[in-house]
Amino acid sequence: MSHRIVLPRLMEVGAGASGRLARVLQELGCNRPLIVTDRMMVELGYVARIAGQLEEAGIASQCFADTLPEPTAASIRAGVDMVRQGDFDSIVALGGGSPIDSAKAIGILGKFGGEMRDYRFPRDVSEAGLPLIAIPTTAGTGSEATRFTIITDETSDEKMLCAGLGFMPIAALIDYELTLSLPPRVTADTGIDALTHAIEAYVSRKASLYSDAQALEAMRLLAPNLRAAFNEPGNRAAREAMMLGATLAGIAFSNASVALVHGMSRPIGAFFHVPHGLSNAMLLPAITAFSIPAAPERYADCARAMGVAAQTDSVEVANDKLLAELRAINQELSVPSPEQFGIARERFFELRETMARQALASGSPGNNPRVPTEAEIIDLYETVWNQE
């Protein structure tokens, strides 16, 4: 049995990689880029720095900086209009997962038209949009190396998973120095998101030897460095490990898919505006406990790769240590419960069935080692609400 592996054509990795943008554009034959980003990147001066580098190389750029933290079909519309009305030959995505996801959608809609819901899973979007160069500024989503984008349909409060080669960046510039200014909360949420990607890719029913290698190495990089990056924002070694780990985790899940945590996380984010990484963190311990009986050896491998279990530990002991570590990470990194985040219990329980249906419809739960029924997902939402 063969497995299809999809990657960016070109990746620059390491300190200062973002400074290679002009050269990369030239190598790709692009000279009229639209920079897609958010207001924070403008305020931090990152956009001016990159635009200045391009100008020095004789490349004129424009900027769309109105992406939202959890992008909606409406929030990207102005960017799509800019592409349709302009003469751009490429898109540069600068920021965390949300600007990169927005840029992916803008590149496809700007070239082919239609509505975002037209491209939702299970459609396989193989059409090539505008060439996309991704420059991540968080160590989390791995979106710079994935063939997915997540956009919320604000008319139904559904986070739509869109997948296909058309959403894969042609190039990624992975510069950990851009993460040195991240606040602890963002570091924690994006870091746990990356760890979730690695774990879910490894236990996915679509996993392969290739994705396994990326996922295990991602866990080896992420787990020992997450606390250091959270507690010591200027720790360059920890930041570098987190950035590379997040990208490897992105490569892993882009080729093996994510599973139940992500399937259940998207409705929480859509209905209650919980940041994606944070909703994953809320779910990860409970979903892992639910899933371990169906793939105990795979989860034990995760515990060993993360450095919390020894090679000599039994599978059962390793999995106990894995669950203890996931709970400890949430506690030490101050991950709130749904109630502590501010979600009303009545509303959460009222939406359980709708969230369960949306989770199943996304397709991600079908990749889980233990594939849940709708009733089991409803029960798991209750478990997450009631957990200490």
State what each model feature region is.
Residues 1-64, 387:
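An N-terminal, well-structured beta->alpha segment
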Residues 148-256, 375:
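Carboxylate- and glycine-rich phosphate/diphosphate-binding segment that chelates Mg2+/Mn2+
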Residues 256-324:
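C-terminal catalytic subdomain
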